[in-house]
From Swiss-Prot:
The lineage of its organism: Bacteria, Bacillati, Bacillota, Clostridia, Eubacteriales. SUPFAM superfamilies: Ribosomal protein S8. GO terms for cellular component: ribonucleoprotein complex; ribosome. This is Small ribosomal subunit protein uS8. Part of the 30S ribosomal subunit. Contacts proteins S5 and S12. NCBIfam families: PRK00136.1. It holds the Pfam family Ribosomal_S8. GO terms for biological process: translation. HAMAP family: Ribosomal_uS8_B (MF_01302_B). Belongs to the universal ribosomal protein uS8 family. GO terms for molecular function: rRNA binding; structural constituent of ribosome. One of the primary rRNA binding proteins, it binds directly to 16S rRNA central domain where it helps coordinate assembly of the platform of the 30S subunit.
Amino acid sequence: MVMTDPIADFLTRIRNANMVYHDKVEVPASKVKRAIAEIFKNEGYVKDVEYVEDNKQGLLRIYLKFGPNREKVITGVKRISKPGLRVYARKEEIPKVLGGLGVAVLSTSQGIMSDKAARKAGLGGEVLCYIW
């Protein structure tokens, strides 16, 4: 079956694993997914991200993070720009997720970065997803 939106599939796998308290989730790897996962790690939403070679495209193993009493660190993940409806934001229009508590992930001309990094660099781009 052909996958029309691999990023949405990636986010859904993370969301589903988080909802049932799995410690890790494996997703087919790509450069974009790896960059998004690294942003999630740098922002403190996941514990670790590792690339696993499997003689195909590879796998990303993402270790999810939970609080001391197993409370979820990731409350929600949402795909914004979809194949059927792309969403772009100029540098002045970069959205704040939950008033700054969440993170927007953008694809800019300088690569994939968080909303804070894009504002600092003065770049706009395609709004890929929100995580909070």
